[in-house]
Amino acid sequence: MVWESCGPAMKRPTLQWGSKPSERGLSSPSSTGLPVAGKESPESRAAVAGAETGSGWTRSNKGGKKTGGALVSATAILIYLALVKLAVLLLTAESYGYYRDELYFIAASERLAWGYVDFPPLVAAVTAFVRWAFGDSLPSLHIIPALVSTGTVVLAGLIARELGGGRLAQGTAALATLIAPTILAVSTWLSMDAFDQLFWTLGAYLMVRILNRDQPRLWLLFGLVMGLGLLNKVTILYFGLAVFVALLATPARRHLRTVWPWLGGALSFIFLLPYAYWQIQNGWPTIEFFGNYSWKVEQDSPPEFLLKQILTMHPVTLPLWLAGLYYLLFVREGRLWRPVGLVFLMLFVLFVVQNGKFYYLAPAYPMLFAAGGVALERYRIGWPRWDRIRVAYVSVLAVVGAVSAPLTVLPVLPVETLASITGTVNGNAGIEAEAREAAQIPLNFADRFGWEEMVASVAGVYEELPPEEQAEACILTGNYGEAGAIDFFGPEYGLPKAISGHNNYYLWGPGGCTGETVIAVNVPRGTLRTVFDDVEEADTVSCEYCMPDENNLPIYVVRSPKVPLEEAWPKFKFYK
């Protein structure tokens, strides 16, 4: 695109992209219309493109001369950013407390299986390994997500490299991935999400490499990554579906005429077979879980979903990922990787239509950051200070990211200070992932508070029971967070293991609990009265910074079951 002069008094900037495939070191289009990469590396192809005067592509080093040596090379910058992220995560690993889901995964790690109601088996297996290798302290649990998320940062830079980007492109892509709040937040606790982001980003890297180098055998490796991803979180199926449709919709469909993508797809589903067998054996509980999903998720209109994308990926990254999307979809030099842009568009639409949580789309952003980094590096605007503007933008990414992270995702501020700031900015700024009342602090922090206080309150009630009732008492909770907390902290207080009807705790059943004496936490009184003749409120759980639905909870002591607890167990079933 060229902006023409607007009269003698004013000369508008010139914006141009190279228009010939040969400028990027590509051969002529194949018979299907898809350009096939030449033998040159992505870096050499980008250099050829940048050599054209007025092409709009600029070299990161003028005249082809290296500046600064290895210490400021693209690889070195990726290493520096990776070390920064790893250091930040490890230094904050012990802050606040155990996240709700971590307590659940710890419980699952003691009951390893090929599947669970609300998640596939990988995260429980990883948790079991971490506890075996490092223990179950907060720093120990947070080592793996820190390493995994650091890998995602590096992969974002490598995607930019594969797209032909140099030092600026790779560093910008990695930096944006580092500071994006949703990506950074899930790096601070052990969960499926950090792994999910890694598998998506690795899949995107392989996809770009396959398209770039015409190496169809890499679809096997792509299938392996998707298979591991399916063992972690089934939403990666959306990514796989989007890749397939994007290939069909572009000249890259020629890959589907080879055996390799089909073998890769078959390989990924082989990984899923044990999980599918577990579903069959247990009556497909995950289907019921997803059927109840809308109860838990905040309902968003398309504009609200888009606004949450902008806010939770950080507003300062908006120009970068929009530039990346534009480059992939509309710029001629990006046509080889057009399927990547289509993947993002389809995922956006799918999650809006399916009412997915806003952070489901987060794993798709590193590939846009990479393309945006290439656009920032290669897109020439005829402004005298454009180079300074580009450097200033990257500096803003770093500074704003460093300032905002402690306020939104990193557990570093004193909780009193965090609560004061949260109140000043009106809670979570309207960003809610779940249909739950907002706390004094954001949900990703609030769900780390109150667990041990709850256990201590239950222990106080337990100690008031006569010895004969203590010997037979069970602890029934309303959700897996409370049950996981009882199981984890309870032994220090001499408490028995918890039972619950929530998600996989329901499948684990009431165990040997007779129901003659039960301490019930956060279970509706009406439900208890349908099962027990004697329902007595004994205490109330209170916590200052926890989620409101975990505060002021009644603790009941119930006795005299109307039927054996095993028979009444379905009344407590809660797949949500």
Residue ranges and their predicted role:
Residues R111, A174, L206, L218-K233, ...:
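Membrane-interface alpha helices of multi-pass inner-membrane proteins
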Residues E110, L155, A176, F195-R213, ...:
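Specific aromatic-rich, kink-prone transmembrane helix
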Residues L81-A82, A173-P181, M226, L230, ...:
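Short helix- or helix-capping micro-motifs
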Residues R161-G164, G203-W219, G324-E333:
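Membrane-interface transmembrane helices that cradle and orient dolichyl/undecaprenyl
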